[in-house]
Amino acid sequence: MLYPAELPGLFKSPSQPAWTRRAVMRHALSMNFGLAHRREASIRRALRLSGACAALAAVVLAFPSLAACGRPAGRVQAIGVDERLDIELADGRAVRLGGLDAPSPDRGAPEIAKAARDYLSERLLGREAELIVLAGGTDRWGRTVADLSLPDSEPQSTAEALLGAGYARVRPEFETRGCATERLAIEDGAREEDLGIWRDPDFAVIQSSNSAGLSRRSGRFVVIEGMVRRVGFARSRLYLELVPRDGPTIVVARRLETALAREGRPVGKLVGQTIRVRGALDDRFGPRIEVADPAMIEIARSVDAPGEAKPHP
């Protein structure tokens, strides 16, 4: 600590009265103490921040597949799973596993819906889990949009476990954009093995040529597979027309063009490719899906030859 005689701008003058010198010294000491106190507070804040960063880094290392999808929000305990696979926590909150499309009482085979609920209950009930809260925090019904991670399980992510067992499929959402690639790969394995919902016609992939199947699923979340026969370009949208000629149209916002190209799916080269598209099916003016997220489009089978028509920019 600097003493008053050592402080810049402070000096003793013999001509000053003693009471003046004492007042100056008290003022200087208080200023110096204030500076030291502020420096100490800054150091404490820096240490707290570094500790928080270290804790966050430890969680990221422990749960690497979740790091891009959300933030750790503490340990919780699940005490119930309802028929829609919402998870009830001991603290009273309800958790919706974000980015998933799962069976429910009004959709899908009842035995598969029950198996999914039993699977989730066996995995979670009576155990502590790490709550990974996704962007947005809660939905319009007050449910916490999150994932639950079990450090001693494989996979640690409950959402990934459901996908791998075939009890859910990926439903692209803004909150899960960071881990969409990993989730789609896990889903692909369950679909190839025909697990769970992939045996159920209500959840199975619909071929673009199946007009009757498309009509029955109007207004619902679907996964469609088909070859792109033409790409149409407009000012704000792109139109991917799937075979046959009266097949589904995939409407893509032009703002996604760069993101699709960066992820290896340039729109101009999709003609002749077999793609898999997921989203809400609108059949009012012919079957169509509006694409709002790059993860809604996958290349199912890649070929080098062009399709029936070339894109018209």
What are these regions (language model features)?
Residues 1, 24-25, 31, 43, ...:
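Short hydrophobic transmembrane-like helices used for membrane targeting/insertion
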Residues 27, 32-34, 51, 63-313:
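Small beta-barrel nucleic-acid-binding modules, primarily SNase/OB-fold domains
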Residues 48-58:
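Sec-dependent N-terminal signal peptides
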